């Protein structure tokens, strides 16, 4: 079972409101990847958030949720909250996905995980073109580094500090890494 955290604690400043709740094709954005992965038995999904409405959506849809005010301290707060809880439950590795990347498929994430495992590296990141992007995965050896992150620093800080320890995997379809940060991007994704 692949332990997967969906990071859903952001402030969505460029969007103007909580984009994770914006309905994309009839479903709140945060639920697209969460439900797609949860329905696939290869994954155990946990959403990390500080938003009451996201927590309520998770509860209504049977998705595990870590509610933490630490998310208000930036991306690192969400990562720390998730790592602490899953490490206590014995997770050997954690895969991180973004709540605003609704196009990621379970098959892509499973293929990334399989290739990462075969690499023997302690951490891995997908590539969209030449750019590292979510999802990213970290073995338990990386938990101390993840727990030491501060502010809006995410796993990319660790990946860039230790590239020799990182497995980089080109996404077969880089469109799956698209995130939605602005209302204009959101409107482009709506059916006509």
Identify what each model region corresponds to.
Residues 1-4, 144, 148-192:
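Conserved alpha/beta core of the MobA/IspD/sugar-nucleotide pyrophosphorylase nucleotidyltransferase superfamily
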Residues 72-144:
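Conserved beta-loop-beta/alpha segment of the NTase-like Rossmann-fold superfamily
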Residues 23, 103, 137, 168, ...:
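Short aromatic/basic micro-patch
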Residues 20, 44, 64, 122, ...:
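Conserved beta-strand segments of alpha/beta enzyme cores
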Residues 1-52:
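N-terminal glycine-rich phosphate-binding loop and ensuing alpha1 helix
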Residues 31-93, 107:
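Conserved N-terminal catalytic core of the sugar/cofactor nucleotidyltransferase
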Residues 22-23, 47, 67, 96, ...:
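Conserved SAM-binding loop
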